[in-house]
Regions:
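Extracellular/periplasmic bilobed ligand-binding domains
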Residues: 34-130
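Short glycine-centered, acidic/aromatic-flanked micro-motifs in structured strand/loop junctions
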Residues: 24-25, 82, 148
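Sec-exported extracytoplasmic/periplasmic mature domains
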Residues: 12-17, 39-47, 68-75, 93-100, ...
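An alpha-beta-alpha
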Residues: 1-54, 77, 171
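Extracellular/periplasmic periplasmic-binding protein-like sensory domains
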Residues: 92-165, 219-221, 225-234
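Segments of small-molecule ligand-sensing domains
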Residues: 150-162, 172-225
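Hydrophobic alpha-helical segments within soluble ligand-binding/sensing domains
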Residues: 1-19, 32-34, 60-63, 88, ...
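Generic detection of short hydrophobic beta-strand segments and adjacent strand-loop junctions
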Residues: 53-56, 203, 231-233
Length: 235
């Protein structure tokens, strides 16, 4: 649900839109959970949710009917939490074909977005993710990239590499915090409520181990993702 909450915060505070819409797949827990979280957070942020549409699954190929309703409702911003294989070739082009030219935003499922040949369709498309090599706000990022390239024949690290890297150092921090005679239980207790500063952002883990963290926003320009901003979690 966290990506949906962050998207609502971004729409309200950064883009400063007033009318938003959401489209999600009811048969997919990821899509529906994030989509509903966005709608709830948007209302709390004072945004008007002019349309809340859904599809029977998260891998349909036809969304024109729902998108026509969203366009007719006057939405300035559409949150569509689907995967790269659906949002890229179907939802975004179909939204443009019904006359919707506003913002489209998604979660990290947009990483590696499959696009059609007409890259202009993807202007005003954004998504949240964990990591960007262009993030100048985090000094750890460039050090990580240099070290990774040196150890891996100049290969570029991706989001999952960065997440794995942070996981190792987060565990090391927890073990150190647990002390010299660390046990499984003491390490688990050390992780609970622990704050961590990593390549993928700064975050705090709650008692269940779920992170409340900063999130990267990328914007597509000429079909290529570019760093837009970093959103810090609400206190």
């Amino acid at each position: 649900s966290y990506p949906g909450e962050i998207a609502a915060k971004f729409a309200a505070e950064t883009l400063k839109v007033k009318k938003v819409a959401v489209l999600y797949g009811t048969g997919d827990p990821y899509s529906s959970g994030v989509g509903k979280a966005f709608a709830d957070a948007a209302k709390k942020a004072g945004l008007e949710v002019v349309a809340e549409e859904n599809s029977s699954s998260a891998d349909d190929t036809e969304y024109s009917s729902q998108l026509q309703k969203i366009q007719a409702a006057g939405a300035e911003f559409l949150y569509a939490p689907y995967y790269y294989s659906v949002a890229g070739p179907y939802i975004i082009p179909q939204a443009r074909s019904v006359g919707y030219d506003g913002y489209v935003m998604g979660p990290d499922g947009y990483d590696g977005l499959k696009m059609t040949d007409d890259k202009s369709l993807y202007n005003n498309v954004l998504y949240t993710t964990h990591y960007s090599p262009d993030d100048a706000s985090n000094a750890k990022v460039q050090d990580f990239i240099k070290s990774y390239k040196k150890a891996n024949k100049n290969a570029d690290p991706n989001t999952f590499t960065a997440l794995a890297y942070d996981s190792v150092y987060m565990m090391a921090q927890a073990i150190e915090k647990a002390g010299k005679n660390a046990t499984r239980e003491s390490v688990r207790n050390a992780i609970s409520g622990m704050s961590f500063e990593g390549v993928t952002g700064n975050f705090t883990l709650d008692k269940k181990g779920s992170p409340k963290k900063s999130v990267i926003v990328l914007e597509l320009k000429d079909g290529k993702p570019q760093y837009k901003t970093t959103i810090q979690p609400s206190k």
